[in-house]
């Protein structure tokens, strides 16, 4: 999965997919009542990027729905996975469940079109704080209460705080999650980060009894780092330059080992060599 980083304006969806992304990451900010408000990152963000592009969250969802609904004039067949980077740092811990409920209602209405031929992309809820694990239950309970448990099949999870792998496992246990787990590891492109924890996550994924199904590394903008991440066995790479990742995947060393995921590839299934 080539994951376009910080895609917060509707116009950027096309831009990143056209460069080779089959997945995008979108920031979601919340208001003081735990309502998802904007797709907005703000300053500081990554080196070489405009941090200030934004939409109202529900407007972005409608644009995203158009881009991921077959038959729509804006449809992009390649776009199959969306990571919502949930900026829950502005919330109190006791608002996490509420944030999950409100997020679910927004997605149900504006993205999934209340289950009536809505967007088809798989969705990952990425949470920066392990203490905010109740967000997951708030979200999943709401889908069930609203009569759409089938949409849980489209839903995956990520804790993005680079916490110890064992602590992340405990948070999922509390949240009642087993499966559909992506594990992120990374740091802003302005700084360097080694691959120690990525390798640990990959080992957990491949152990047969770990909690991780997929591992992605962020934010990778250079060819050398892309090669290192692929050599470590990641499933996804988040990038500001999808064309760079595409180029490396076309190199002789990687062409036979990796391919770009399509809609038919289940993002919740651990890949067995």
UniProtKB/Swiss-Prot annotation:
Give the tissue specificity.
Expressed by the venom gland.
As recorded in UniProt, its EC number(s) are 4.6.1.-
Q: Can you supply one Gene Ontology CC term for this chain's record?
A: extracellular region
Per UniProt, the cofactor note for this protein states: Binds 1 Mg(2+) ion per subunit.
**UniProt cofactor(s):** Mg(2+)
Instruction: List, alphabetically, the InterPro entries matched.
Output: PLC-like_Pdiesterase_TIM-brl
Question: So what does this one do?
Answer: Dermonecrotic toxins cleave the phosphodiester linkage between the phosphate and headgroup of certain phospholipids (sphingolipid and lysolipid substrates), forming an alcohol (often choline) and a cyclic phosphate. This toxin acts on sphingomyelin (SM). It may also act on ceramide phosphoethanolamine (CPE), lysophosphatidylcholine (LPC) and lysophosphatidylethanolamine (LPE), but not on lysophosphatidylserine (LPS), and lysophosphatidylglycerol (LPG). It acts by transphosphatidylation, releasing exclusively cyclic phosphate products as second products.
Tell me what this protein is called.
Answer: Dermonecrotic toxin LhSicTox-alphaIA1iv
């Amino acid at each position: 999965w080539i994951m376009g980083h910080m895609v917060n304006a509707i116009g950027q969806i096309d831009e990143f997919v056209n460069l080779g992304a089959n997945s995008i990451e979108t920031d979601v900010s919340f208001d003081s009542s735990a309502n998802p408000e904007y797709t907005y990152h703000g300053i500081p963000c990554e080196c070489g990027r405009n941090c200030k592009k934004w939409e109202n969250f529900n407007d972005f969802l409608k644009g995203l729905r158009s881009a991921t609904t077959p038959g729509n004039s804006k449809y992009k067949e390649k776009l199959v996975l969306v990571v919502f980077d949930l900026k829950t740092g502005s919330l109190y811990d006791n608002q996490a469940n509420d944030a999950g409920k409100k997020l679910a209602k927004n997605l149900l209405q504006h993205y999934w079109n209340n289950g009536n031929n809505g967007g088809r992309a798989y969705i990952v809820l990425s949470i920066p704080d392990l203490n905010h694990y109740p967000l997951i239950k708030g979200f999943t309970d709401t889908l069930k209460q609203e009569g759409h448990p089938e949409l849980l099949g489209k839903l995956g999870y990520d804790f993005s705080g680079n916490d110890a792998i064992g602590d992340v496992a405990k948070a999922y246990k509390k949240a009642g999650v087993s499966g559909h787990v992506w594990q992120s590891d990374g740091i802003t492109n302005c700084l360097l980060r080694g691959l120690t924890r990525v390798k640990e996550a990959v080992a957990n994924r491949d152990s047969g009894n770990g909690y991780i199904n997929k591992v992605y590394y962020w934010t990778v903008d250079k060819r050398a780092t892309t090669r290192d991440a692929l050599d470590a066995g990641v499933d996804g790479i988040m990038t500001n330059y999808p064309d760079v990742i595409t180029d490396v995947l076309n190199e002789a060393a990687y062409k036979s080992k990796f391919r770009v995921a399509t809609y038919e590839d289940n993002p919740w299934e651990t890949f067995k060599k």
